[in-house]
């Protein structure tokens, strides 16, 4: 007899955008067409599985088989091969990005295996639109225990002993927050869930609402019981229609089952939950602005005190918690404070959920114990940086967070450590940046967002963010001036210390941390008018040319080769580099690392094309016009000491400028370390000799076996009429 299978088809926002709706319909049709009585098709919160770029995803339970990139046309094969014959569809399985090995079960994939999913415990394993699925997983047991077996004070004590801290910002102790609200005088109190989540690239709260809304409702109801509230609000963005839909369904089903409403579970406790759809204002993530929005006022922060626990929504004592905080409450009540406190660090307990995005192989939701090193999250779980790029920094905490450089990769992720590094935990955004990221531009990008979203109520937020943005924009456009960095630091510190709300106080973090850790990039923009990452358009023509150490016009010579104009190509290269054949063999080609084509598949083979053009030239040199010496338009003689690549390059360009130039070399051969250090199989000697002969033909005199020493000094060169001496003696010996 065939085992019964439950097929969970991701129906969350990312997978829906990739066509999972059609996959769901196709699987339904195939199960019916093939008359498979051993299969049930369910929608799921597979977005909570977290591996977003692998969607649309399908999970076949009870074995946990994970299919990726599933399309509607794959449904017939899944139904016939897997569901009917028991054979896995290997081409749709997840494959290890390095080894290419197929990994059938999602629990064996490093991305999942190295996580600890407590907050996301049900995401991807249940149908979020069926409360029975949640109940079957132990849902609402914690609520039953709280309202029937515990007093409100005992609930608060359990949360306090667990060490739960707010997962939406500064990490204020949740138990303490509840206690303050419970002890505040007043007959009417409110509990509010902040599900606004306005950070760009953050989708943790939305994922929980879409994949496991009952966990939030249960946590919110327990919070209401603990502080003595009879009403609660879920403040969610109207631009999250699927999340709004599923929280509505969950609320209706919870009320029908007696988990909400009057006399919950016969306990005498009454509690109702309302949904307030926000208009998408970032500042409404701040708790006082959020309450103003619920009151149908303009969402603007207000000074504190009084704090929300004293005077919040409608002037009543109110408690506001984040989605992840409330979703943690049921497991604490059910499993106990001691269990929860055993996870994490001494001051940061439990797990944290992060939205891992940016330049990362595996983007998605990650849940790990507090104190997990950044390196574990980024490399072991996230799979590292794609396309062989180098890790540069990670930005945590959303647009108000800081950028943490590579030297702190082994730092534990907890509230205290992130604060010491100049960043914040925030709502859990984690944007990975690689070597192609300009840190000045990233600071400008995040500040442009916070400046646009600033409510303008306080002068530091209204004017300070505008002034910082103007300075950063000026710097990225190549118009930065000396002193701009110090001005930025001064304004940022003022905004941080004087802003009215937490958003204003943290928005300078990207500026402060990028200056602190990447000041050299700011100085390059201002002093050299150069963007080291080749990102700022105003400071470059093309990324490859900008990155080339000698600034060769790479697009031009590549275009010449494409048109069959090989001589014009080599002439273009020699405008900036007299060694095209040598560099075509041994250059480390940083230009290819910045090639825009590499973002699609593979970079253009710039070095190989350079070698091709140079080899073509020397293969056809007898058919080409003989190179003529550059005309000598200057009367000042110049001596160059050393016939290595530096000395020969200097002599070549001096001759090009019209100066009579002579190179003095102690050895019997030119090329310096090119000739005496690089093996012949890597750089043939005849290639070096051809390049040197070309330089000599352009008018550079080279005198071998002529060391400059005590017997023949620089003063002797001056006596011989040389008015300038360039010393390119090299560094043959270690310091």
Segments from the language model and where they lie:
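FAD-binding core/adjacent interface of flavoenzyme oxidoreductases
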Residues: 172-174, 557, 589-641, 656-657, ...
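Glycine-rich FAD pyrophosphate-binding loop
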Residues: 659-675
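Flexible inter-domain linker/hinge segments
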Residues: 93-161, 314-315, 321-336, 540, ...
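Conserved phosphate/anionic-ligand binding catalytic regions in large, soluble enzymes, centered on
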Residues: 15, 159-181, 223, 280-292, ...
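Ferredoxin-type iron-sulfur electron-transfer modules in oxidoreductases and energy-metabolism complexes
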Residues: 1-5, 20-43, 62-91, 133, ...
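Hydrophobic alpha-helical positions that pack around
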Residues: 114-115, 244-370, 382
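N-terminal Rossmann-fold NAD(P) dinucleotide-binding loop
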Residues: 647-648
């Amino acid at each position: 007899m065939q085992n019964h299978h439950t097929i969970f088809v991701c129906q969350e926002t990312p997978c829906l955008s990739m066509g999972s709706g059609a996959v769901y319909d196709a699987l339904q049709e195939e199960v019916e067409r093939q008359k498979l009585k051993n299969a049930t098709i369910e929608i799921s919160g597979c977005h909570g599985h977290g591996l977003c770029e692998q969607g649309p995803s399908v999970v076949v339970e009870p074995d946990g088989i994970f299919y990726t990139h599933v399309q509607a046309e794959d449904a017939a094969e899944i139904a016939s091969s897997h569901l009917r014959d028991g054979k896995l569809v290997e081409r749709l399985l997840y494959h290890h990005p390095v080894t290419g090995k197929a990994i059938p079960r999602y629990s064996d994939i490093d991305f999942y295996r190295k996580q600890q999913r407590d907050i996301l415990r049900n995401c991807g394993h249940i149908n979020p639109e069926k409360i029975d699925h949640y109940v079957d997983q132990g849902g609402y047991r914690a609520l039953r225990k709280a309202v029937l077996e515990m007093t409100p004070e005992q609930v608060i004590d359990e949360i306090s002993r667990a060490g739960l801290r707010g997962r939406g910002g500064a990490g204020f102790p949740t138990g303490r927050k509840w206690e303050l609200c419970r002890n505040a005088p007043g007959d009417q109190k409110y509990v509010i869930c902040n599900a606004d989540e306005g950070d760009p690239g953050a989708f943790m709260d939305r994922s929980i609402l879409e994949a496991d809304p009952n966990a939030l409702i249960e946590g919110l109801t327990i919070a209401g019981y603990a502080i003595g509230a009879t009403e609660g609000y879920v403040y969610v963005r109207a631009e999250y229609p699927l999340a709004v839909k599923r929280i509505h369904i969950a609320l209706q089903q919870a009320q029908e089952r007696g988990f909400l409403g009057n006399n919950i579970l016969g306990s005498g406790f009454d509690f109702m939950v309302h949904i307030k759809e926000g208009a998408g204002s970032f500042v409404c993530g701040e708790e006082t602005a959020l309450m103003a929005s619920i009151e149908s006022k303009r969402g603007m922060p207000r000074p504190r005190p009084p704090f929300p626990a004293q005077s919040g929504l409608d002037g009543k004592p109110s408690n506001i918690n984040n989605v992840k905080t409330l979703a943690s409450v049921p497991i604490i009540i059910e499993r106990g404070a001691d269990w929860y406190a055993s996870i994490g660090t001494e001051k940061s307990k439990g797990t944290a959920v992060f939205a891992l995005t940016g330049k990362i192989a595996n983007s998605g939701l990650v849940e790990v114990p507090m104190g997990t090193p950044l390196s574990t999250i980024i490399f072991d779980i996230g799979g590292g940086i794609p396309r062989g790029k180098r890790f540069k920094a990670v930005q945590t905490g959303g647009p108000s967070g800081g950028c943490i450089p590579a030297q702190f990769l082994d730092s534990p992720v907890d509230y205290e450590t992130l604060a010491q590094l100049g960043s914040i935990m925030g709502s859990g955004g984690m944007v990975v940046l690689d070597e192609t990221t300009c840190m000045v531009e990233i600071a400008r990008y995040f500040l442009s967002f916070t400046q646009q979203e600033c409510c303008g109520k306080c002068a530091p937020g209204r004017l300070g963010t505008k002034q910082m943005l103007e300075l950063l924009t000026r710097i990225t456009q190549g118009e930065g001036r000396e002193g701009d960095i110090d001005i930025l630091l001064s304004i940022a510190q003022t905004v941080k210390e004087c802003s009215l709300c937490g958003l204003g106080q943290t928005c300078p973090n990207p500026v402060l941390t990028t200056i602190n850790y990447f000041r050299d990039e700011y100085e390059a923009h201002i002093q050299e008018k150069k963007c080291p990452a080749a990102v700022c358009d105003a400071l470059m023509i093309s990324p490859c040319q900008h990155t080339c150490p000698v600034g060769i016009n790479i697009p031009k010579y590549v275009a010449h080769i494409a048109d069959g104009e090989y001589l014009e190509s080599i002439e273009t290269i020699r405008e900036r580099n007299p060694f095209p054949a040598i560099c075509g063999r041994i250059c480390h080609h940083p230009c290819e690392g910045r090639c825009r084509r590499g973002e699609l598949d593979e970079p253009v083979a710039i070095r190989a094309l350079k070698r091709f053009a140079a080899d073509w030239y020397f293969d056809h040199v007898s058919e080409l016009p003989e190179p003529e010496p550059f005309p000598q338009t200057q009367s000042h003689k110049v001596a160059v000491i050393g016939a290595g690549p530096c000395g020969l390059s200097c002599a070549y360009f001096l001759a090009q400028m019209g100066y009579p130039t002579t190179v003095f070399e102690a050895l019997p051969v030119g090329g310096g370390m090119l000739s005496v250090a690089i093996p012949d199989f890597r750089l043939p000697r005849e290639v070096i000799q051809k390049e040197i002969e070309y330089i000599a033909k352009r008018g550079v005199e080279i005198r071998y076996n002529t060391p400059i020493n005590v017997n023949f000094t620089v003063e002797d060169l001056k006596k011989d009429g040389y008015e300038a001496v360039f010393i390119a003696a090299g560094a043959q010996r270690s310091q």
